[in-house]
Each structure stands twice: as structure tokens, then as C-alpha cells.
Regions:
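A short local loop/turn or secondary-structure capping micro-motif enriched for an aromatic residue
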Residues: 29-30, 47-50, 160
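Glycine-rich loop-to-alpha-helix module at the N-terminal edge of alpha/beta enzyme cores
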Residues: 37-127
Length: 170
């Protein structure tokens, strides 16, 4: 079993909008769990690659991304969801190969990723600091604390769903 043709090099890291080799050049084998065969080599990023990613993300947050309105950011997330749906078959095939799950389940995970992006895209300009009332005798308030740049560790068995839940919300 082999991977379909990809529009990027899986042995590269996506940093600051550019696919590039890991700084130390290391890769690791992506193994098909259904039969133990090597599907491809993928980037084995190290701390310097993470540092470059964080620096690029912080620069975007302090620049163009951070200056976008909530409505604009929401539209971008919604567009990501649309793109996922446009490529759902490819993403499902990749997910099935990567984690060894049935294609129907992998497809459902890709659709869930799209739906998370649509949900967070739609809610981006709906958060206004309102506090939901609670029981009498309690003081409740809303404190907005932006996270800034965040890192996400994604488990091997549900990568698309976890990306949707965590990256979409961030």
C-alpha cells in the first residue's frame, strides 16, 4: 500500500508558510500499522524547528494575523473547513494509512475537522465577554485572557479531530 501523490514534501516542516527541511535534516519512517510497511519518510523536527515555528507564529500574531478582526479570523477558519471538505477523500486516505483505521472512520474524522473549523469560525466574532448568570449569592465574571502563541501535541489515533478541537479554538 502506498500514499497518494501529495502536494507537499512530507519530509519537510511547514514553518512561516513555507515547506522546508528540518534544520538538522532528520526524518523518520511513517509505518503503515496494518502491515508494517514504510509509507514514506516524514520530517523529524527538533527543538530548533519548534523555536523557528514559535518565532514565526509570534511574528504573525504581532503583525498581520493579530491585526485581523474577529470576523476576518473567523472567515479564515471557515475557509479552512471548506478546503478540508473539498479534499476530504485525500485526507481520509492519508488518515487511514497513517493511523490504520478504516477509511469510513477516517473520512468521518476529516469531516469532523471541517465542522470544528466551521464552528470556531462562526463563533469567532460572537464572544463579547458576557457572563452567564449563576446561582444567587455567587459572584461570577468573565475575564478575557488571550493565550497568545500555543503549541499542540496531537495523539497518533485522532490527529484530525484533535487538530480541529485545539487549533480551531486557539
Amino acid at each position: 500500500m502506498s500514499l497518494p501523490d501529495l502536494p507537499f514534501n512530507p519530509a519537510h516542516c511547514l514553518i512561516n508558510g513555507t515547506w522546508r527541511a528540518p534544520l538538522d535534516g532528520q526524518t523518520l519512517a511513517l509505518i503503515d500499522p496494518s502491515n508494517g510497511s514504510e509509507l514514506t519518510q516524514i520530517a523529524r523536527g527538533q527543538s530548533r524547528d519548534i523555536d523557528a515555528s514559535v518565532e514565526a507564529a509570534q511574528s504573525a500574531l504581532n503583525g498581520e494575523w493579530g491585526s485581523k478582526t474577529a470576523l476576518e479570523r473567523g472567515r479564515i477558519l471557515t475557509r479552512i473547513g471548506q478546503l478540508v471538505l473539498e479534499h476530504v477523500d485525500l485526507l481520509a486516505e492519508l488518515e487511514a494509512h497513517d493511523v490504520g483505521k478504516p477509511l469510513t472512520q477516517a473520512r468521518a474524522d476529516a469531516i469532523a475537522l471541517a465542522r470544528y473549523m466551521e464552528f470556531y469560525g462562526g463563533s469567532a466574532d460572537k464572544i463579547h465577554g458576557e457572563t452567564i448568570p449563576y446561582l444567587g449569592g455567587y459572584t461570577v465574571y468573565t475575564l478575557r485572557e488571550p493565550h497568545g502563541v500555543t503549541g499542540h501535541i496531537v495523539p497518533w489515533n485522532y490527529p484530525m479531530q484533535i487538530i480541529g478541537r485545539s487549533v480551531g479554538a486557539a
